[in-house]
Amino acid sequence: MKNLGGLFKILLLFFCLFLSTHIISVSCLNSDGLTLLSLLKHLDRVPPQVTSTWKINASEATPCNWFGITCDDSKNVASLNFTRSRVSGQLGPEIGELKSLQILDLSTNNFSGTIPSTLGNCTKLATLDLSENGFSDKIPDTLDSLKRLEVLYLYINFLTGELPESLFRIPKLQVLYLDYNNLTGPIPQSIGDAKELVELSMYANQFSGNIPESIGNSSSLQILYLHRNKLVGSLPESLNLLGNLTTLFVGNNSLQGPVRFGSPNCKNLLTLDLSYNEFEGGVPPALGNCSSLDALVIVSGNLSGTIPSSLGMLKNLTILNLSENRLSGSIPAELGNCSSLNLLKLNDNQLVGGIPSALGKLRKLESLELFENRFSGEIPIEIWKSQSLTQLLVYQNNLTGELPVEMTEMKKLKIATLFNNSFYGAIPPGLGVNSSLEEVDFIGNKLTGEIPPNLCHGRKLRILNLGSNLLHGTIPASIGHCKTIRRFILRENNLSGLLPEFSQDHSLSFLDFNSNNFEGPIPGSLGSCKNLSSINLSRNRFTGQIPPQLGNLQNLGYMNLSRNLLEGSLPAQLSNCVSLERFDVGFNSLNGSVPSNFSNWKGLTTLVLSENRFSGGIPQFLPELKKLSTLQIARNAFGGEIPSSIGLIEDLIYDLDLSGNGLTGEIPAKLGDLIKLTRLNISNNNLTGSLSVLKGLTSLLHVDVSNNQFTGPIPDNLEGQLLSEPSSFSGNPNLCIPHSFSASNNSRSALKYCKDQSKSRKSGLSTWQIVLIAVLSSLLVLVVVLALVFICLRRRKGRPEKDAYVFTQEEGPSLLLNKVLAATDNLNEKYTIGRGAHGIVYRASLGSGKVYAVKRLVFASHIRANQSMMREIDTIGKVRHRNLIKLEGFWLRKDDGLMLYRYMPKGSLYDVLHGVSPKENVLDWSARYNVALGVAHGLAYLHYDCHPPIVHRDIKPENILMDSDLEPHIGDFGLARLLDDSTVSTATVTGTTGYIAPENAFKTVRGRESDVYSYGVVLLELVTRKRAVDKSFPESTDIVSWVRSALSSSNNNVEDMVTTIVDPILVDELLDSSLREQVMQVTELALSCTQQDPAMRPTMRDAVKLLEDVKHLARSCSSDSVR
């Protein structure tokens, strides 16, 4: 028993030894390992390598073999690297317990949350990379404890707040990347303390304020990225102290002032990008000192002056991009000494003179981009002989001369865009034989001869634009077989013959051959060009039928085959063109009925079938075309009645033309539902009944019902139409004019007044009833007369004399009134300087340089209304704004009043634009833009800063007065409200023809939107210098419809627009692309202001903002690249 007890003790001892050994092996994982396991708890997702290695192992006392871990000699964690490991979760505060950590790389994962402040405890950290994650909130200010930190990457996160000042006091910091966050506030002054900093990237944040001058103390800086922030102020001169600087990007900020950069200290500078700022002055000549400079990029920096010749000293320069500035003068020939130059971009400036032949010496030059300047003369032959050029972009200049045969030897040439110049002569026949051309754009020159056959010899041609020249002959078959062409424009030439067959699987997407002499059938092979989105073959001599193969073009959005000699019926297969938005086959000889399956065109906005031989009644499916806004099917043989379902096309806004179709019956009642319709033509039919249905068409600007069999009175809402276009109602012998219409209507119309039925009816009253009525009427009149006499006697004592002006405290003194009356000889006719809707204007010169304009208002109201007017005028007199005419004084009497204004020496905007000698006051675009902005400011003030708001109701050039500096001042504001005391709307129209908003055409609805419409018309006058209703316009066309029509016919092409609608005086000025872009933006604003629907118009505050933005136009482009 005793032995058994001893054996048990021995076994128990062994068990205890085994158990203790096991426990020791579990707890022997060192503290760094345990810290890592704690960090693991904060992670939502880790790669398999982590789950398989990050765990307790009896045979390992350290985590040195774990995935992503590297240890130092003491078996402490020195590096944690999870880069690109698809880890998600948060970085726990336990990270601060890794005291030996030297490298922490968690880049390119999905970490979120804040950066733990405990990182400041990792005092041995040399590299901290948390880039490309989702960290948010502020950068902890404890990082300044990392005295050994050399590299800090925090870019591409969601960090916010200001930078800690202490960040730049980390003594050994060499690399700091903070780009692509949402950091705000100023750049700390402490940046100058970062003596060891070599690379600093802070771009694509929200930093504001000035770049600190102290940055010049960061003497080790080589790379500095500050672009795409909100920095202001000037470029600090202290940057010139950074002798080690190789790369400087400060583009896409709002920096101002002169560029003072380029000291002898910049020898190491390789790349300089100052683009998209608002600098003053020119390109600093001192940049010629930066002898190592490889890329100089200052795009849209608001630079002016000339290009310094000192840039020719930069022998290593490969990229020179000074585009989109206001540089003037000529290109210095010294640039020909930049022997390494690869890219020269000087486009979108105001450069003049010839292109220097010295540029032909640049043997490495690949891209020469001089477009949108004012260059003249010929392109030097040395450039045509270049064997390095791949791109030659010189469009929109005044260049001339022939295209030399040497052009055909440019073996690397890919892109040649010469459009909108004055090149003449033939295109060299061999062009394309020796090079792989990709883009050839010669539109808008004076080129003659035939299309060269080898343009697509290299089978890479994507764009071939030869429109608006004098070319003749046929299209070479090789061009039709060129599958790579995407955009093909030959419009407005003298080309003839048949169109070539197009290859299968052609890349063609845009085809415009309009206005030539092409003949024969339209090739069915066009239907194989599946990418086609636009076809314009109008104004040619094509014959035969429309090929049904065109129905294969499911991406086609625009088809114009108008004004040809096409015949036959419309192929039903076209219904498969389900993307079609505009379809025009007008002015052909097509016949038959319109296929019902065209109802598939759900996106169609414009349908033009006019001047053909279509029959079978107006198509019943039209209401299914919900987006249809223009329907022109005039002068066909549709016959039948107008289907009532047309009234269901709610978006029918612009035009409904059913004229000349032999239509019968009455106008269907549903047509009255087209309340947005602006143009209606149902003339030359056999329609009967009354026009009462048209009462509801309140948006109509033009209507023609002539040559039908209508009867009865013309609706009240068409009174204005009858006055302006009486012929639109002629040929209806039984139509008549209501007695409520103005007498002037009858003077211009052959129609008679409607019979007054009340006069022809017998009263049916007996003799004694008539006597009784007469007696009672006499008694009533007597009572009224006695009452009026009594009232007059009561008021006589306190009433002013009839011709005496009434004064209040706020009104001008009687002495000034006497001077005004004396200066105008009691308002003598000879002092008249204008007549307006509200009265006559006189010029009163009171000596000592004081000249006033005196407006005499005539009232029809009684004296109480005048007292109300005094309060109203008093309110107007307190309105103060630089773009509003200031009321200097006013006087009232019973029947009229005088209002005194400062005299404007330049007269009105109408005088300046349309006066007898407008050339004496020609406004350049800058002046016109300032007028547009000034008027917008004035109207915005009236609409939103006056209480109550003032709606002008008669904005037009005559009411915009110009001071000696051509600053605009709006006049007559408040007078419409002063002279009309109704509350909501009136039956009479307030405003001037051409400026009246559609909703105000036949009654006045008070709203700011009507002023916005009138303002839009004024903008169009500034752009076009045409009157609102100009004699040059087609009949029944105002400036709004004329501009919309012009833009529509040009497919919104910028060049076409400039030549079509813009004032010819501005054309030379608009060679500057930024100004041309301004004109486009202002035109778009005008069209937005003149939309039919008042709710769709911008407010005047919107207009001011857009115009302010236009002032600083800058094309969007990434400044991350120097190109």
Curated annotation (Swiss-Prot):
Residues 1-28 form the signal peptide. Its main location: membrane. It is a single-pass type I membrane protein. Residues 29-769 are extracellular. LRR repeats lie at residues 31-53, 74-98, 99-122, 124-145, 146-170, 171-194, 196-218, 219-243, 245-266, 267-290, 292-314, 315-338, 340-362, 363-386, 388-410, 412-434, 435-458, 459-482, 484-505, 506-529, 530-553, 554-577, 579-600, 601-625, 626-650, 652-674, 675-696, 697-721. ATP binds at I833, G834, R835, G836, A837, H838, G839, I840, V841, K855. The active site is at D954. The modification Phosphotyrosine is found at Y901, Y941, Y995. The chain crosses the membrane at residues 770-790. The keyword Transmembrane applies. GO terms for molecular function: ATP binding; guanylate cyclase activity; peptide receptor activity; protein serine kinase activity; protein serine/threonine kinase activity. The modification Phosphothreonine is found at T824. Coiled coil: none annotated. It catalyses: L-seryl-[protein] + ATP = O-phospho-L-seryl-[protein] + ADP + H(+); L-threonyl-[protein] + ATP = O-phospho-L-threonyl-[protein] + ADP + H(+). It is found in: Cell membrane. InterPro entries: Kinase-like_dom_sf, Leu-rich_rpt, Leu-rich_rpt_typical-subtyp, LRR_dom_sf, LRR_N_plant-typ, Plant_RL_S/T_kinase, Prot_kinase_dom, Protein_kinase_ATP_BS. GO terms for cellular component: plasma membrane; plasmodesma. Interacts with PEP1 and BAK1. Interacts with BIK1 and PBL1. Acts as a receptor for PEP defense peptides. Unlike typical immune receptors, senses an endogenous elicitor that potentiates pathogen-associated molecular pattern (PAMP)-inducible plant responses. Involved in PAMP-triggered immunity (PTI) signaling. Interacts with and phosphorylates the kinase BIK1, a central rate-limiting kinase in PTI signaling. This is Leucine-rich repeat receptor-like protein kinase PEPR1. It comes from Arabidopsis thaliana.
